[in-house]
Amino acid sequence: MVKLGCSFSGKPGKDPGDQDGAAMDSVPLISPLDISQLQPPLPDQVVIKTQTEYQLSSPDQQNFPDLEGQRLNCSHPEEGRRLPTARMIAFAMALLGCVLIMYKAIWYDQFTCPDGFLLRHKICTPLTLEMYYTEMDPERHRSILAAIGAYPLSRKHGTETPAAWGDGYRAAKEERKGPTQAGAAAAATEPPGKPSAKAEKEAARKAAGSAAPPPAQ
């Protein structure tokens, strides 16, 4: 062990009394330590770096967003609350529009037909007719409805309301056909050997014309 106040400059062969003067000039190897040197005094003020005071480097600024700018933009809490409310209103209006379109496409056209009728292929069809054709042959019913839908409306109205001159023409034609049909029936009932009354009248008329006297000169 090293003793206090000893130096390596001394030699073991010399007297310790002669070494006292040399020991006074030499520096001791180990000196007593002060307790105040072991623990430094605590500072009165502690500086803490915050986010605003801390400066990020260029690569760090690209990774992290500008939080301070976002805070300045949303400084008012009311504006931040208005954004979700506006989105909810827009979503509700879009949903309401979709519901109205579905209502128009599915149920609204059905109300245009009167009671007891059903809308099929944009035509009001009676429910009894619908049930009848459905029980018989559904495919035939569909083809009939398709043909009715393809038929022009002008032709439909023409067949439903015939003109007055058509009725008069049919009546005159039936009157002309009536006497000829009656004569043919009478000729069929008479015997083949007996001449008809019409033939007798024509023969008498010819005989009277030939027997008439010539006019006086």
UniProtKB/Swiss-Prot annotation:
Transmembrane segments: 88-108
Superkingdom to which the source organism belongs: Eukaryota
Entry comment describing in which tissues the protein is expressed: Expressed in the pyramidal cells of the prefrontal cortex, in hypothalamus and in caudate nucleus. No expression in spleen. Up-regulated in the prefrontal cortex of schizophrenic patients with nearly twice the levels of non-schizophrenics.
Keywords: Cell membrane, Cytoplasmic vesicle, Endocytosis, Glycoprotein, Membrane, Transmembrane, Transmembrane helix
Membrane protein topology class: Single-pass membrane protein
A GO BP entry: postsynaptic neurotransmitter receptor internalization
One function term, GO molecular function aspect: clathrin light chain binding
Post-translation changes: Glycosylated.
Region called Disordered, residue ranges: 1-25, 162-217
Subcellular location: Cytoplasmic vesicle membrane; Cell membrane
Recorded GO CC terms: cytoplasmic vesicle; cytoplasmic vesicle membrane; endosome; glutamatergic synapse; membrane; plasma membrane; postsynaptic endocytic zone
Extracellular side: 1-87
Function: Interacts with clathrin light chain A and stimulates clathrin self-assembly and clathrin-mediated endocytosis.
Similarity comment: Belongs to the NSG family.
Name the record gives this protein: Neuron-specific vesicular protein calcyon
